[in-house]
Amino acid sequence: MDIKSEVLAIIDDLFMEDVSSMMDEDLFDAGVLDSMGTVELIVELESHFNIDIPIAEFGRNDWNTANKIVAGVTELCNA
């Protein structure tokens, strides 16, 4: 499974929301993510991909869409 598919599966598992058709939609505005959900997502992404996501890099506008989350995880996995 590639990073994109894995990230989408994690989002679907955590929030029971298939975001594959709304990759560029703001997940906060869509009601998928909120502050608690963001914490859950960070913890799950860090655990699943064995990465550390600096909180300073997980700003709402920096990781607010599925595409941005996938890009951020990909960058951290390749660092």
UniProtKB/Swiss-Prot annotation:
Q: Name one GO biological process term.
A: lipoteichoic acid biosynthetic process
The subcellular localization recorded is: Cytoplasm
Listed under GO cellular component are:
cytoplasm
Give one Pfam family: PP-binding
- Keyword Ribonucleoprotein listed? The answer is no
Species per Swiss-Prot/TrEMBL record: Streptococcus agalactiae serotype V (strain ATCC BAA-611 / 2603 V/R)
| Alphabetized GO MF terms | D-alanyl carrier activity
User: What is the protein name given in its UniProt record?
Assistant: D-alanyl carrier protein
Q: Which SUPFAM superfamilies does the record match to this protein?
A: ACP-like
Q: Relate the protein's function as given in its record.
A: Carrier protein involved in the D-alanylation of lipoteichoic acid (LTA). The loading of thioester-linked D-alanine onto DltC is catalyzed by D-alanine--D-alanyl carrier protein ligase DltA. The DltC-carried D-alanyl group is further transferred to cell membrane phosphatidylglycerol (PG) by forming an ester bond, probably catalyzed by DltD. D-alanylation of LTA plays an important role in modulating the properties of the cell wall in Gram-positive bacteria, influencing the net charge of the cell wall.
